[in-house]
Amino acid sequence: MRILLRILSSSAVGLGLLTGLAQAEDISIATVNNGDMIIMQKLSAAWEKETGNKINWIVLEENVLRERVTTDIATKGGQFDIMTIGGYEAPIWGKQGWLAPVDDLGDDYDYADLLEPIKAGLTVDGKLYAVPFYTESSFTLYRKDLFDAAGLTMPDQPTYEQIKEYAAKLTDKSKQQYGICLRGKPGWGENMAFLGTMVNAYGGRWFDMDWKPQLNSEPWKKAITDYVALLGEYGPQGATANGFNENQTLFATGHCAMWIDATSAAGRVYDPKQSQVADKIAFTRSPIAETANGSSWSWSWNLAIPATSQKADVAKSFLKWATSKDYVKMVGESEGWVAVPPGTRKSTYALPEYQKAAPFAETVLQAILSADPSKPTKDPVPYTGVQFVAIPEFQAIGTFVGQQISAALAGQQTVDAALEAAQTQVERDMTRAGYIK
């Protein structure tokens, strides 16, 4: 309770928003239906009570959220006062003037405590356009009990060839036990988040140095062929409907021997209140193939204020509250230390309670800090971004490619047909946008 009062007082005083100094307002927040955000929604009732302000929550599935907030910000619709956006959108939208700067939350916010690579990725021309709520890389989670029973040992750095061997040995569909769970739901931030890293590991790239698409190149063909075979033979039925949340549920309920996905999942699958296998799991690095470059992604979910908001001061008060050092401690005390938002503040990793509760903490931190968006694969590229390409056109391009690959996974077309369709469309898009001369 002391932490709660301190955090509320700090966020209100720093922005002149203590009850009685400003009229109470209603604000609308659009966010994703991930576990960390559900906790934020739950705890925000205390912020409402203390400040008198009210929150209208719009909590959406990941693909739907992206569509809604992108449409709203591009059309200046003004539906939202706070948006949950990724490390892809923040610098692009900030540069467009679509977001309000958020580098004025007060000295006590301690901007220096934010992890530098994450803060830098949200900054354009010296202005911060979003504050990180949690950050993630990707890694391989696996069932150590199943590995032990099968006489298998997971190496510190697995290859995709080894992952395929393990998946074959650990699949028992009669028990609904699948060797591997991977994202199959189409979307630039769903199946393509994972596939971007897999293609990188196979030595592939989105574009050559002249911005010509490389989607029908041999590395892409090999990576996607292996993905379709791996998930088709050893994954759950209906994998094309499974994104992050669906696979997290499958893993936490004991249906996946391995799961390659976001490091942020660790806080839930290691929590015995949310996971049936919390004491049976371990983790290691994401698999590699031809190279380790770009084999683990880099992603942040962030809170930002659209430039159209008429309630920016109240919105900033909430941002300060929800992304502060004291909020991290409040989550630890109320929800368990394993559940605190990862990857945003240096101080989180110095907390003895977090170090004790989260055996994955140091591994996750190093994965986040070591991701290099400027060198995402074996060969040179004209873009930055590990699992995405940091250009405005990528949202549409990535989703189209994801849809083609999802259709191949469903058996509706061959991998070659999917990649040829993707190559043709993306080449057309990049020519129209002026990248290809």
Kindly give the residue locations of the regions a language model identified.
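Short, solvent-exposed loop/beta-turn-alpha elements that line the ligand-binding surface or hinge
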Residues: 100-114, 184-187, 202-222, 271-276, ...
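Hinge/lid segment of periplasmic solute-binding proteins
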Residues: 86-137, 162-164, 179, 191-194, ...
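C-terminal lobe and pocket-closing loops
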Residues: 264-277, 289-399
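Conserved C-terminal helix/tail region of periplasmic/extracytoplasmic solute-binding proteins
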Residues: 49-50, 54, 148, 372-437
